[in-house]
Design a protein with these regions (language model features):
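Condensing-enzyme catalytic core mediating Claisen C-C bond formation in acyl metabolism
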Residues: 1-59, 154-222
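Generic secondary-structure signature for well-ordered alpha-helical cores
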Residues: 21, 74, 107-108, 133-136, ...
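Conserved catalytic cysteine-centered active-site region
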Residues: 43-46, 52-59, 89-139, 145, ...
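Short, surface-exposed alpha-helical segments at coil->helix boundaries
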Residues: 62-66, 96-100, 214
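Phosphate/pyrophosphate-binding loops at sites that engage ATP/ADP/AMP, CoA/4′-phosphopantetheine
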Residues: 68-82, 220-226
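Short glycine-rich or small-residue beta-strand-to-loop segments that form or flank ligand, phosphate
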Residues: 82-90
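Structural motif
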Residues: 85, 141-143, 167-169
């Protein structure tokens, strides 16, 4: 990242002050997945190029979020976030605030507001939209991390990788500012995972494309431009 100063300046603007990401060191070769499953899932051949990130046994959404947050604070010397939000659908604790663990590991003041958001991979984007639309005093630290378990021989096993990202939103020499946005909600189920289950259930990809991206997403883009 190439952030500017974290404090207000003459041309200070509210927006993204810095972004960082953290990926596990391990990589899974997609060709290795195909070699194991091509007898039953030959359609994976089209996805069997390259590799994806894979968390090790001692890594989870919290540890990856800590690393992403640590890199972000190093990029913004003197920045002390007043809030820390962790978005993930794979939080290691169901009844313990995961964001508080991250905040403690990052050395944030004990008065910082911490919260977990979950139930959808879109939760991180929703939190970012809220932070940009509703400026709050000080700097907001937004973290997102995932360590999803894909069903064997599924397209997700090829596509979904593990990792974390961190964003600082506040007033300063912003890398990017919020110009315009719109939202549209719909109970469109492209995939879902029931409570107590490890794997997602996904719908047919052409239906997701035609009924989801080409209808819902395009309508949202048009509404924003209007």
């Amino acid at each position: 990242p190439t952030p500017g100063p974290s404090g207000p300046t003459d041309d200070a603007a509210h927006g993204l002050l810095a972004t960082t990401r953290s990926l596990p060191r391990l990589r899974l070769e997609r060709s290795a997945v195909l070699a194991q499953h091509q007898w039953m899932a030959p359609g994976l051949r089209g996805l069997a190029k390259g590799r994806r990130s894979m968390a090790s046994w001692d890594e989870d959404s919290v540890t990856m979020a800590v690393e992403a947050g640590r890199q972000l604070l190093q990029a913004l010397p003197g920045c002390v976030p007043g809030t820390a939000t962790l978005a993930s659908t794979t939080l290691p604790f169901a009844d313990r605030q995961n964001a508080a663990i991250v905040a403690a590991a990052l050395g944030l003041p004990d008065g910082a507001l911490t919260r977990d958001v979950s139930s959808s991979p879109r939760a991180a984007l929703a939190e970012l939209a809220a932070a940009l639309r509703q400026p709050a005093p000080g700097t907001q630290l937004l973290l997102a991390a995932e360590r999803r378990i894909a069903r064997p021989a599924s397209a997700q096993e090829m596509i979904v990788g593990d990792g974390a990202a961190a964003i600082a939103v506040g007033c300063g020499a912003a890398l990017a500012t919020h110009v315009a946005s719109t939202t549209r909600h719909a109970d469109f189920v492209d995939h879902f995972r029931e409570s107590g289950h490890d794997h997602d259930y996904g719908w047919e990809e052409r239906w997701v494309r035609d009924e989801g991206y080409l209808k819902l997403a395009v309508a949202a883009f048009q509404r924003c431009l209007d």
